[in-house]
Amino acid sequence: MNISATARSLLLSEFVSAFFLAMRYFFQPKPTLNYPFEKGPISPRFRGEHALRRYPNGEERCIACKLCEAVCPAQAITIEAGPRRNDGTRRTVRYDIDMVKCIYCGLCQEACPVDAIVEGPNFEFATETREELYYDKAKLLANGDRWEREISKAIALDAPYR
């Protein structure tokens, strides 16, 4: 055993350096959040709870093209289109999403030509029963109305990358 190794073991240099390292981090601000009361920042591309959007005049955006239903890999979306209106457009009669099947891939949002179906910023939608995770058109439109300000802001921030 050489002299330097003996000196290091007697003087406990590793212990002292580790102690000073721990003290340096001990006095820094804590990086944790008090979660239910404080929330961290969310990316504009965050994929949370689904929502159906409306136009500013209150009309729903969905034109019943069924692209989101076709592209969904989990087959979680079910759409029934109503008859054509006088102006030639269609609207949905039934728009259901089975959130139990959904894998939050965002393909429905990418496929939609009118930005009708989006995945909003809400990530707190735990339920007590499984049936509450079957979203119908009314629930999706209510989500869209509730989160419209945040959704439109996120879409505007993401626009340069589309």
Swiss-Prot record:
Catalysis: reaction(s): a quinone + NADH + 5 H(+)(in) = a quinol + NAD(+) + 4 H(+)(out)
Highest taxon in the source lineage: Bacteria
Cofactor needs: [4Fe-4S] cluster
Membrane-topology descriptor: Peripheral membrane protein
Keyword Chloroplast on entry: no
GO molecular function, one term: iron ion binding
One cellular component (GO) term of this entry: plasma membrane
Keyword terms of this UniProt record: 4Fe-4S, Cell inner membrane, Cell membrane, Iron, Iron-sulfur, Membrane, Metal-binding, NAD, Quinone, Repeat, Translocase, Ubiquinone
Occurrences of domain 4Fe-4S ferredoxin-type (ranges): 52-82, 93-122
Cofactor, free-text remark: Binds 2 [4Fe-4S] clusters per subunit.
Amino-acid positions noted as binding [4Fe-4S] cluster 1 in the UniProt annotation, renumbered to this chain: 62, 65, 68, 112
Annotated binding of [4Fe-4S] cluster 2, by residue: 72, 102, 105, 108
Enzyme Commission number(s): 7.1.1.-
Localisation: Cell inner membrane
GO biological process, one term: aerobic respiration
Protein purpose: NDH-1 shuttles electrons from NADH, via FMN and iron-sulfur (Fe-S) centers, to quinones in the respiratory chain. The immediate electron acceptor for the enzyme in this species is believed to be ubiquinone. Couples the redox reaction to proton translocation (for every two electrons transferred, four hydrogen ions are translocated across the cytoplasmic membrane), and thus conserves the redox energy in a proton gradient.
Subunit details: NDH-1 is composed of 14 different subunits. Subunits NuoA, H, J, K, L, M, N constitute the membrane sector of the complex.
Family recorded in the similarity comment: Belongs to the complex I 23 kDa subunit family.
Protein name: NADH-quinone oxidoreductase subunit I
